Amino acid sequence: MCSIMGYCDVCDDLEAFQKGFAKTISRGPDDSRIVDTGNGLLGFHRLAIMGLTASGMQPFSLGGSYVVCNGEIFGFERLRESLSDRYTFQSDSDCEVLLPLYETYGTEMFRMLDAEFACIIYDGKTQEYIAARDPIGIRPLYYGYDKKGTIVFCLLYTSPS
């Protein structure tokens, strides 16, 4: 399983985010990336299972929006095919369908997913974050608040040291 983390406001302490995010690296030791959305941070530790090439590395981006996801999207090939006239896919990753789905259907896209997942989407147009998980929480997604009251999402809860 991979690890995802999101900080949903302009971050003035990248080191603190990196320190917390580093505690989850055991879930994704193959590669790591943090992207600054301009309105917060999204982090991804990769355990390469699907989309094994570098193009399958997250966060995925599309038109100023970003997504990080830990999950398995069943039947993603069918979803890719339905979006292929509007979007050229860059990888074999099942999670790459999420942003084109979101751009096309908004949050209604989650009803279309046969999946076990936890994801965080940053919408570059509205400058909002959307966090979601599968209905029964096979892939849990925790949230909390920092000292400033900013919401933080993480796939794996780790207690402060």
Question: Model-predicted segments: where are they?
Answer:
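Cysteine-centered catalytic environments shared across enzyme families
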Residues: 1-159
